[in-house]
Amino acid sequence: MTPVSNHGVAESIFDLDYASWKIRSTLAVAGFVFYLGVFVVCHQLSSSLNATYRSLLAKEKVFWNLAATRAVFGIQSTAAGLWALLGDPVLYSNKALGQQNWCWFHITTATGFFFFENAAVHLSNLFFRTFDLFLVVHHLFAFLGFLGSAVNLRAGHYLAMTTLLLEMSTPFTCVSWMLLKAGWSHSLFWKVNQWLMIHMFHCRMILTYHMWWVCFQHWDALASSLYLPHLALFLFGLALLTVIINPYWTHKKTQQLLNPVDWNFAQPEAKGDRQERTNGQVPRKKRL
């Protein structure tokens, strides 16, 4: 089965021969390079323009740049995922086997992004001696899942694209964390963004239920089109998201709305220390 071609005469990125492994691997590498570039550009711009960034610890700067990179990927993923969920007639009519060239582009570049994300997270953990189990597991499963979709010409694209839609929360997470570090956690803008982010996490939970429904409704077609290890990986990852990761992150973000603390880097408060703290740190003047 070859990928379904989009209509149109003009040559474009969506009109490439995605049956070619060379094309798909090239776009995966391009995705890695592009998001590495976003990371580097964010560091350069923030170093030059942002006083808050310059005051951060090295590991916080890495997290800042990763948050911005994830936000850019989240915008791409949300747009692609919404179109697959609501607008594309080919994917809507065949949720198990339907393919589109524009989906191949997003699947391959997402593979490159998740490879970058895994490399960055592991290098950061190694250098700074930190470890976030949920984040590591989440991105490992994401990379392996999209790699499986990128190499399998028979795999349908609907579930892969709705998986991308799970990144809908990342732009809000980026804004939340940056404003938190700038000392704006009591501003109306931060609170509105936090409410929207929590809502996005609830939408993620609803979306995972929809993905389970698609799996049950189209089980035979999925089982015949996906390699068994890929299918098992997808189902196990979806189960982790549904039962553990999504509820945990939703709980933590709701806690953060009520108690604006940077729980990624906040140091344990010394016993008897009554000094008021903001964002897990001693309050300091707001700046951007």
UniProtKB/Swiss-Prot annotation:
TLC domain location: 62-262
Membrane-crossing residue ranges in chain numbering: 26-46, 71-91, 103-123, 131-151, 225-245
Main location: endoplasmic reticulum
MF term (GO), any: ceramide binding
Cross-referenced InterPro entries: TLC-dom (IPR006634), TLCD (IPR050846)
Keywords for this protein: Endoplasmic reticulum, Membrane, Transmembrane, Transmembrane helix
Highest taxon, organism lineage: Eukaryota
Calcium among keywords: no
GO biological process terms held by the UniProt record: adult locomotory behavior; adult walking behavior; apoptotic process; associative learning; ceramide metabolic process; cholesterol metabolic process; glutamate reuptake; lipid homeostasis
Intervals of motif ER-retrieval signal: 285-288
GO CC aspect terms: endoplasmic reticulum; endoplasmic reticulum membrane; endoplasmic reticulum-Golgi intermediate compartment; endoplasmic reticulum-Golgi intermediate compartment membrane; mitochondrion; presynapse
Membrane topology of this protein: Multi-pass membrane protein
Subcellular location as annotated: Endoplasmic reticulum membrane; Endoplasmic reticulum-Golgi intermediate compartment membrane; Endoplasmic reticulum
PROSITE patterns named in the record: TLC
PANTHER family: CT120 PROTEIN, PROTEIN CLN8
Biological role stated in the UniProt entry: Could play a role in cell proliferation during neuronal differentiation and in protection against cell death.
Subunit relationships: Interacts with CLN5. Interacts with CLN3.
Name of the protein described by the UniProt record: Protein CLN8
Naturally occurring in which organism (per UniProt): Rattus norvegicus
